[in-house]
A protein has these predicted regions:
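Catalytic and substrate-binding clefts that recognize carbohydrates or anionic sugar/phosphate headgroups
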Residues: 1-158, 168-170, 174, 181-186, ...
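Glycine-rich, histidine-containing beta strand-loop boundary motifs that form or position
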Residues: 42-44, 94, 102-105, 113, ...
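Catalytic core of carbohydrate-active enzymes
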Residues: 63, 78, 376, 382-398, ...
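Short, hydrophobic/amphipathic alpha-helical packing segments
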Residues: 65-71, 84-87, 178, 286, ...
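Extracellular structured ligand-interaction cores
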Residues: 85-89, 96-98, 106, 129, ...
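A residue-level signal for conserved active-site and pocket-lining positions in enzyme catalytic cores
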Residues: 90, 147, 184, 224, ...
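Short acidic-glycine loop/turn motifs at beta-strand connectors
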Residues: 92-97, 260-262, 569-570, 579
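Aromatic- and carboxylate-enriched substrate-binding clefts and catalytic-loop regions
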Residues: 190-496, 531-532
Length: 650
């Protein structure tokens, strides 16, 4: 059952799409206060677990730490980080009873989950203007499905988006991209997408293409499609301030950029230099910005990724002036200004919360200060595109995913988990984040495989790809200045061919399970706790996940390991895709097992009485042969497979 409670005058985020009548008073769980802002406090029993929060740090069970919903462009994802790129304010308290809460609040929201006091959870925010939805049910999964039912259906990506993609910040010219595709095809490593980072643009201006680097962009797009490759260009949140740039001039003329309190347009620097931000909370501006995607769709593009949309700010005029004044005092020998103060001011320039207080949105004629609704920017930027795609391409799906998000954005696109690093711990973070994202409606998700920042290693990339085989978004992405990490940069290319090839062998199953989850408000990834709630060991296992109703995955995520320990909550069939293209199969009883997994192998476990469809190796999604599909698993088991054309809107 879902109950809705109204506090103060909430901002309409439109995260919830189902009409739910308001209930009087407070939820009959914990204590609620509106004396100093808003707070919800409840005691946690020893056995209680807390699930949710979507894109958040640490484990699947969120007990023992402080999490802050405050979309932040901070690439240093260490354990102490309290905020990442998204704000997903849905939690489930799971113990002897099951209860879920969605705090529909677009500003900064704190979740102290046994951090200050180990047996107490407190959720708080500055202003007592929000909706609180309380959901009760028979199980954690029941609560998730009820919640998903009120926030609307998850976005459905085109089938080609379930192929493998290669990306790197640093591909600049048409020749760069053609070289990447050529090397993949020459080495027979599967590939369906190549991502275009900011260097394809003219001076980092949205909806432009550098004509020197791409003299015939439309022809290039078509050439790539002949190679069965979809190009995926990036779109950033900031619009360059430049006379003669049509997007800038039109936005100024129509009043579609965010303004300062005095009515002038707010300026901050991002990649293009000084920029304005489209006022995507203004319905007219949102439509205007979304329609601009047709500039690229009309040239054959059918996939995009939105970035820098927290929105990220390098510095503002005020921030720069403050830094310059501090630096001047230091240079002049002011004893009150030590060197570390200058360094601190420099670090504080980017994404400074004071800047978020300096600009406003026009929402139905009312001026709303950005910091009060900060977490909605990425959501509404992607919404602008998603709504435009329905007009531009009413019959055909277009791939869209974003960096920043709020619940509700899942209806318009997926997300990638942002600028991670080439750390073994980030494989595990990737794994643990997936079910939490699914709880909040984000099904098309994945991380930068191999790591975005720092330098990857061959073994790290192979192990991460073996997890990426199962994530809907399977993309290798790296930062400018890091070690090149395309598979053909390493020895024994056949190992990469095999691991990535397993993805294509499993697409008949993985795509089917994704579509079932999207159409039935279900989870693609589930924690073991959701499937085996009465098994104490399963409830406390966080480095294994269930996919659909048939399989469990348990990737290797430590360096130099030849395998790993796995807990089986029931009898399962251990299946290993071997480096030579064959499969190893062994039925294992319930219990703890050590399984060996070589670097060029991909393991999975099929539940007792189940089987899954597996195809032959293919180098692209269109090359997967239907007639090659066979069932792998328990003899006599059946599987209901979802199929469609992979293109038409549903």
């Amino acid at each position: 059952m879902v109950k809705k409670f109204v506090y103060g005058t909430p901002f309409e985020t439109e995260a919830v799409v189902k009409e739910i009548p308001s209930s009087e008073g407070n939820p009959d769980y914990g204590t609620f206060s509106t004396e100093n802002g808003f707070s919800f406090t409840t005691k946690l029993a020893d056995e209680d677990m807390v699930f949710g929060l979507g894109e958040a740090n640490r484990g699947i069970n969120k007990r023992g730490f402080l999490y802050i919903s405050d979309c932040a462009d901070d690439p240093n994802h260490v354990e102490s980080k309290t905020s990442l790129y998204a704000a997903h304010n849905f939690i489930i308290i799971s113990g002897k009873t099951h209860v879920g809460f969605f705090f529909d609040y677009p500003g900064t929201l704190r979740f102290d989950i046994g951090y200050t006091t180990s047996d107490t959870m407190t959720v708080s925010c500055e202003n007592a203007d929000l909706y609180v939805y309380m959901i009760t049910g028979d199980s954690d999964l029941d609560i998730v499905k009820q919640f998903r039912g009120i926030i609307g259906r998850s976005n459905i990506a085109p089938k080609f988006a379930f192929g493998y993609g290669q990306s790197r910040w640093g591909y600049k010219t048409e020749d760069d991209f053609r070289t990447v595709v050529k090397k993949y095809r020459e080495n027979h490593v599967p590939l369906d997408m190549v991502y275009m980072d900011i260097d394809y643009m003219q001076d980092y201006k949205d909806f432009t293409v550098n004509e020197e680097r791409f003299p015939d962009f439309e022809g290039f797009v078509q050439d790539m499609k002949k190679e069965k490759i979809h190009l995926v260009p990036i779109i950033d949140a900031g619009v360059k301030v430049e006379e003669g740039y049509d997007i800038y001039e039109e936005g100024c003329e129509k009043g579609y950029f965010c303004r300062r309190e005095d009515g002038s347009y707010f300026e901050a620097t991002v990649w293009p230099g000084w920029t304005h931000f489209p006022d995507v909370l203004n319905a007219d501006a949102r439509k205007w910005f979304g329609d601009k995607y047709d500039v690229l769709v009309s040239k054959g593009i059918d996939a995009f990724w939105n970035d820098m949309n927290e929105p990220s700010i390098f510095y503002s005029q005020e921030g720069l002036a403050d830094f310059k004044e501090t630096a001047k005092k230091y240079v002049e020998g002011d004893p009150e200004v030590p060197h570390y103060m200058v360094g601190g001011k420099l670090q504080a320039l980017a994404n400074n919360h004071e800047d978020y207080k300096r600009f406003y949105h026009n929402v139905n004629g009312e001026q709303v200060r950005h910091d009060k609704v900060h977490n909605l920017f990425g959501y509404n930027m992607t919404r602008s595109a998603g709504e435009a795609f329905e007009r531009i391409s009413p019959d055909k799906r277009i791939l869209m995913f974003s960096r920043s998000s709020y619940i509700g954005m899942h209806r318009y696109g997926g997300i990638w988990t942002g600028d991670n690093c080439s750390w073994w711990s980030h494989i595990l973070l990737n794994l643990k984040m997936m079910p939490s994202l699914n709880m909040c409606g984000f099904l098309y998700t994945g991380a930068d495989l191999g790591g975005f920042g720092t330098n990857t290693t061959r073994d790290l990339l192979l192990r991460w790809l073996a997890l990426g085989v199962f994530t809907p978004l399977m993309r290798n992405h790296a930062a400018l200045g890091t070690r090149e990490q395309e598979p053909y940069q390493f020895e024994h290319i056949e190992d990469f061919r095999n691991v990535i090839g397993v993805r294509y062998r499993l697409v008949p199953y993985l795509y089917s399970e994704y579509m079932k989850a999207a159409l039935n408000d279900d989870m693609y990834f589930k924690p073991l706790a959701f499937v085996y709630p009465d098994d104490k060991l399963a409830r406390n296992t966080e480095d294994q996940l269930m996919i659909g109703n048939e399989i469990m995955i348990a990737p290797v995520y430590t360096q130099n390991a030849i395998g790993r320990y796995v807990y089986l909550p029931e009898e399962m069939m251990f299946v290993k895709f071997l480096g030579n293209g064959n499969m190893f199969q062994e039925v294992l009883p319930k219990g703890i097992h050590y399984v060996e997994v070589a670097l060029n192998e991909v393991p999975l476990f099929i539940r007792k009485g189940c089987a899954i469809p597996v195809a032959d190796f293919a180098e692209s999604i269109p090359d997967i042969k239907e007639e090659s599909i066979r069932m792998v698993g328990y003899e006599g088991a059946s599987y209901e497979r979802y199929t469609d054309d992979g293109v038409s809107r549903i």
